[in-house]
Amino acid sequence: MSSEGFVNLDKPAGWTSHDCVAKLRRLLRERRIGHGGTLDPAVTGVLPIAVGRATRLLPYLPSGKTYVGTIRFGLQTSTDDLTGDRLAEADTSHLSREAIEAALPQFLGHIQQQPPQVSAVQVQGQRLYQLARRGEAPTELPWRTVEIQSIRILQWRSGSQAELSVEIHCGAGTYIRSLARDLGAVLGVGGTLAELRRTASSGFDLNQSTPLTELLDGAAVPLLALDLPLQHLAKVQLSAETSDRWRQGQAMPVPDSVLPDAAPVRVYDLNGQFLGIGAIAAGLCKPKVVLAAL
């Protein structure tokens, strides 16, 4: 059988997420490779990679992400980070930590956010970065609902261009560049993202990640179990007879199930073999992703 599983990759700066996928395709000689959650080239950290049949499980990974980053106040750029053109500068000597703490709560919970002018968000079928390259950036960026669970201040450095280091827990689709821009706007001085590292994503943690540089130096690609990042889903275990029928596409009863309808679950046979993903409906477990076919 060809290579399959997940790779908890630590992406270096300067690489796109697509670059990482292309490199692993060559290293593993496997075409079926995808990633869970794009990282901008300048951003480092956790990039979940799915190999082989694991690509079918990407929609079921948890959506939570954690970032550690630095916001620089008194600077606005065309990309909302340091890679863009400088648009405006302001002195931030008057800015205080207390002012930051007073402003942060409005960015918590479900909020409306506009993506950066240079981003992968699509407008009328084209990505914003493609429009920006042609000088056709839209006058009005789309608003999107995102969720930020927490923002924790790690360090505050006052000065003429003050900097704030934070840890952010958020949902999928949140742009930390937009947060830096919008926080700076609320404070009246402008802001841009100076540095960002993703420390957790989709069930994977930076502490257990493998740097891409190690793989480039010849280290073996560590493939993790298909069900490793799916522990947030409830587990259903089927008997020998029902597991065979489930793998043939039949919905099977789940005894004493208290799971809500449409809830995705991990499905196993009595030997503990991971069979795939099911969905609960009226006490039945319907096959959604069958990995271990008969």
UniProtKB/Swiss-Prot annotation:
The keyword Cell inner membrane does not apply. GO terms for molecular function: RNA binding; tRNA pseudouridine(55) synthase activity. Pfam families: TruB-C_2, TruB_C_2, TruB_N. One of its GO terms (biological process) is mRNA pseudouridine synthesis. Its EC number is 5.4.99.25. The keyword Isomerase applies. It catalyses: uridine(55) in tRNA = pseudouridine(55) in tRNA. Belongs to the pseudouridine synthase TruB family. Type 1 subfamily. HAMAP family: TruB_bact. PANTHER family: PSEUDOURIDYLATE SYNTHASE TRUB1, TRNA-PSEUDOURIDINE SYNTHASE. Responsible for synthesis of pseudouridine from uracil-55 in the psi GC loop of transfer RNAs. This is tRNA pseudouridine synthase B. It comes from Synechococcus elongatus (strain ATCC 33912 / PCC 7942 / FACHB-805). The lineage of its organism: Bacteria, Bacillati, Cyanobacteriota, Cyanophyceae, Synechococcales.
